[in-house]
């Protein structure tokens, strides 16, 4: 069972509506997950029959059989008009940090738990996806964060995050000390288990669990949520998305720390380091079925009460 690694573009079949925005579609999913593999196989067959060129992310391509065009995420971003991520929000976040570098629309099929970012049902995606491919969809742009670690004035590490950048102890949970500055203005010193700097997208994730407010996706704002602060009056604070957040780690911290980006990428932090978190120039272009309602999603996922009358 070999994989066809030929990435040449076949001619579009006549069944494609040539006025559509999408011609080349990428499939991405969680490797070695039976439910995800089943959905990916159905998607690949369904899209191929309709004449779309389908590229499959190489980590899952070998599990889908033969006659698969396997490529990496960077090539999906560069070549595809639409990327379909099958999995949960974690899979979406991992793909989004790469795909945000490109002008590619991203839509999700939910094979996870809550699925705030994955709209399509795994067992009945065809009807909704067909409408999207025919041009009936809403587009939403979500901005990313850029996190940088400086040591003695030199950049040591950096990465991006869709949800949040979190300063926290490296291995064992314990109190750490640091100062927080907003646009170089001192805000406070903090003794806590860490600090979450979240986008509106991430406000329904780790930040929400830590007591932060939900920010609607269209807000140009960041929320800073201290983790178990030792001052009861310390509360989450919302700042402008154009703000630069600086956290200076006390030299007295005896343990090495980390900055986590979406819980996937970890940047090493030493006592005395400075962490800069700011809005990235990259944006994720999310595709939703027409009529997508954010408050309906919140109500459904969080179990909020339905209309009374």
From Swiss-Prot:
**In the UniProt entry, which residues are flagged as the active site?**
89
Gene3D superfamilies named in the record:
Probable inorganic polyphosphate/atp-NAD kinase, domain 1, Probable inorganic polyphosphate/atp-NAD kinase, domain 2
**Where is this protein chiefly located?**
cytoplasm
Q: Which reaction does it catalyse?
A: NAD(+) + ATP = ADP + NADP(+) + H(+)
Presence of keyword 4Fe-4S: no
The GO annotation for biological process reads: NAD metabolic process; NADP biosynthetic process
The record's section on InterPro entries has: ATP-NAD_kinase_N, ATP-NAD_kinase_PpnK-typ_C, NAD/diacylglycerol_kinase_sf, NADK
Q: Which cofactor does it need?
A: a divalent metal cation
Q: Lineage in the entry? A: Bacteria, Pseudomonadati, Pseudomonadota, Gammaproteobacteria, Alteromonadales
Q: Which gene encodes it?
A: nadK
Q: Which one of the record's GO molecular function terms can you name?
A: metal ion binding
Residues at which NAD(+) binds: 89-90, 163-164, 174, 191, 193, 204-209
What keywords appear on the UniProt entry? ATP-binding, Cytoplasm, Kinase, NAD, NADP, Nucleotide-binding, Transferase
One Pfam family in the UniProt entry: NAD_kinase_C
Instruction: Report whether Lipid biosynthesis shows up as a keyword of the record.
Output: no
Any idea of its EC number? 2.7.1.23
Function noted in UniProt = Involved in the regulation of the intracellular balance of NAD and NADP, and is a key enzyme in the biosynthesis of NADP. Catalyzes specifically the phosphorylation on 2'-hydroxyl of the adenosine moiety of NAD to yield NADP.
Q: Which family does it belong to?
A: Belongs to the NAD kinase family.
The record ties this protein, via NCBIfam families, to: PRK01231.1, PRK03378.1
Q: Where in the cell is it found?
A: Cytoplasm
Q: Which GO terms describe its cellular component?
A: cytoplasm
What is the name of the protein in this document?
NAD kinase
Record organism: Shewanella sp. (strain ANA-3)
């Amino acid at each position: 069972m070999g994989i066809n690694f030929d990435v040449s573009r076949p001619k579009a079949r006549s069944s494609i509506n040539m006025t559509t925005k999408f011609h080349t579609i990428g499939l991405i999913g969680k490797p070695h997950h039976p439910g995800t593999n089943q959905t990916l196989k159905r998607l690949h067959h369904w899209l191929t029959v309709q004449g779309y060129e389908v590229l499959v992310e190489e980590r899952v391509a070998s599990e889908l059989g033969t006659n698969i065009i396997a490529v990496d995420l960077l090539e999906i971003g560069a070549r595809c008009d639409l990327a379909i991520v099958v999995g949960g929000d974690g899979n979406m976040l991992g793909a989004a940090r790469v795909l945000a570098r490109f002008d590619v629309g991203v839509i999700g099929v939910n094979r996870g738990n809550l699925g705030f970012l994955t709209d399509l049902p795994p067992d009945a995606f065809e009807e909704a996806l067909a409408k999207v491919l025919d041009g009936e969809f809403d587009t939403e742009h979500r901005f990313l964060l850029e996190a940088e670690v400086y040591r003695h004035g030199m950049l040591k590490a950096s990465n991006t995050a869709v949800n949040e950048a979190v300063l926290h102890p490296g291995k064992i949970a314990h109190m750490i000390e640091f100062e927080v500055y907003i646009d170089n203005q001192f805000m406070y010193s903090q003794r806590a288990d860490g600090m979450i700097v979240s986008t509106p997208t991430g406000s329904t994730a780790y930040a929400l669990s830590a007591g932060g407010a939900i920010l609607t996706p269209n807000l140009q704002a960041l929320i800073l949520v201290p983790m178990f602060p030792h001052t009861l009056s310390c509360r989450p604070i919302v700042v402008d998305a154009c703000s630069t957040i600086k956290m200076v780690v006390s030299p007295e911290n005896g343990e090495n720390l980390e900055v986590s980006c979406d819980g996937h990428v970890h940047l090493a932090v030493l006592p005395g380091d400075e962490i800069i978190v700011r809005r990235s120039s990259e944006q994720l272009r999310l595709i939703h079925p027409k009529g997508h309602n954010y408050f309906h999603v919140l109500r459904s996922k969080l179990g909020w009460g339905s209309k009374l009358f």
